[in-house]
């Protein structure tokens, strides 16, 4: 296993939106920063699961595509140098006798004066389609993630699911795909009422209450066989792509073994965003405190608090309250 013996000021676990803003703010406080991300790219769930979706509750943006928000955060972060480690899952964090944190991933050992974890809901994976031959079509035309709407242009697309993601993808693909069908096991969708209203007003083929029964096709799925719930009807759809939106399962995984105070799968923090371990901070959906609201906007506020207090932890002479950003950048 490789070992990076450099001791960084701040190591951030998680490269989602809150992690990226944390890295930028660490640069503003003149800290050396490292980001460790388990996925192959930065952006967290926004990039991996919802890159084409619009976000409406980020201050200053009437609406912004998820991937555009990530791109903006990466551009903002690029004002400073960071070390970025992708496809590395942190397996253990240990505070050594000298106060330096030792972080061990599946690839490398890292060292840091402080740690800020911004890992969202922890590791996540999609709920798989439980049909006998489903796995053989993964990576072909069975999709659990949609990273580019245009690859479905002119194609016949079936979507399984009844939540917000399924309905949103159906509505966004309607003007792009040749044909879109959405299949849900219940007549009533779980998605937001306004989205469901738009769905029924659209040209999307809504099939309820049906469940997938069989996938037919040699190299790729060519037909999707549906069975009516508590009924005898069957439907066979000719399709080019199948998108499964059955939600995702998240887990804190090894984080539970790091000696942190955990409450309902969240890390308990003080008003400084520090955990029960001195020098170990948390921000974003991974942490909890009285009155906590899980929003990206909330995480963007928690990130500077974590960084400024991490700076004061490393250097007691440093001010927790930073200078205004205008004074920091006006000569740059």
From Swiss-Prot:
Molecular function, one GO term: ferredoxin-NADP+ reductase activity
Looking up PANTHER family in the UniProt record yields: THIOREDOXIN REDUCTASE 1-RELATED-RELATED (PTHR48105)
Please state which protein family the record places this protein in.
Belongs to the ferredoxin--NADP reductase type 2 family.
| Catalytic function, reaction form | 2 reduced [2Fe-2S]-[ferredoxin] + NADP(+) + H(+) = 2 oxidized [2Fe-2S]-[ferredoxin] + NADPH
Cofactor(s) listed: FAD
Q: Which organism is it from?
A: Bacillus subtilis (strain 168)
The answer to whether UniProt assigns keyword Oxidoreductase to this entry is: yes
List, alphabetically, the Gene3D superfamilies matched: FAD/NAD(P)-binding domain (3.50.50.60)
Keyword Oxidoreductase listed: yes
Pfam families found in the cross-reference section: Pyr_redox_2 (PF07992)
Cofactor mode of binding and number, as noted: Binds 1 FAD per subunit.
Q: What class of enzyme is it?
A: oxidoreductase
Can you cite a GO biological process for this protein?
A: cell redox homeostasis
Ranges that cross the membrane: none
The protein's name in its UniProt record: Ferredoxin--NADP reductase 2
Q: What is the lineage of its organism?
A: Bacteria, Bacillati, Bacillota, Bacilli, Bacillales
For the ligand (FAD), the binding residues are 37, 45, 50, 90, 124, 285, 326
**Subunit composition and interactions:** Homodimer.
- What are the EC numbers? 1.18.1.2
- Which residues are connected by disulfide bridges in this protein? none
Q: Which keywords does UniProt give here?
A: FAD, Flavoprotein, NADP, Oxidoreductase
